[in-house]
């Protein structure tokens, strides 16, 4: 899916007790723990078996932007942006721990990511979704202005 640039770029106002922070060179163990906690229920597998070197080459790349959502000091979600193909930027991952789903925080995270992407002066924004994602994901992306531009079938082996 890709988004037209009609979305709001107003800064997101976070509820009390929440902060959405850029984490440069996130520790690999912290990333793996957050990725697994957020993504296991949704069968996120493509990063699970990477070596430290492979993972670091992705998430520590200067064109990769990781933002973590915290409730107090506890990470409860994250967004990962990939700007390696700039002026195209991909929202690679967006997700929350299960207890935080349904509170509107996913929408706030995507809106904050879109504001950051707009500041980069991107010309195209990509986000991928699939039938394994939370049922609210696709309707959220559509409400925010994303439209489907391609469809493909992929087999995921989750061991």
PLM feature segments, named:
Residues 101, 127-137, 154-159:
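Conserved beta-strand-loop-alpha-helix junction that forms the acyl-donor binding cleft
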Residues 65, 123, 147:
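Short acidic/polar active-site loop segments enriched in Thr and Asp
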Residues 48-53, 59-98:
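A conserved beta-strand-loop-helix scaffold within acyl/acetyltransferase catalytic domains
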Residues 137-141, 146:
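Conserved active-site tyrosine of GNAT-family acetyltransferases
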Residues 23-46:
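Helix-loop element at the rim of GNAT/NAT acetyltransferase active sites that forms part
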Residues 117-129:
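Conserved GNAT acetyl-CoA-binding A-motif
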Residues 97-111, 120, 132-136:
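Conserved glycine-rich acetyl-CoA-binding loop
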């Amino acid at each position: 899916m890709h988004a037209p640039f009609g979305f709001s770029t107003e800064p997101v106002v976070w509820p009390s007790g929440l902060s959405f922070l850029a984490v440069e060179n996130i520790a690999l163990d912290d990333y793996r723990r957050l990725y697994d906690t957020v993504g296991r229920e949704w069968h996120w597998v493509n990063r699970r078996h990477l070596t430290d070197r492979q993972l670091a080459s992705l998430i520590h790349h200067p064109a990769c932007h990781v933002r973590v959502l915290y409730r107090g000091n506890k990470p409860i979600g994250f967004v990962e942006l990939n700007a390696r193909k700039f002026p195209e930027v991909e929202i690679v991952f967006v997700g929350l721990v299960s207890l935080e789903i349904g509170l509107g925080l996913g929408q706030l995270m995507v809106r904050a990511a879109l504001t950051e992407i707009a500041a980069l002066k991107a010309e195209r924004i990509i986000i991928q979704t699939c039938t394994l994602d939370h049922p609210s994901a696709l309707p959220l992306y559509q409400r925010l202005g994303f439209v489907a531009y391609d469809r493909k079938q992929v087999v995921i082996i989750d061991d």
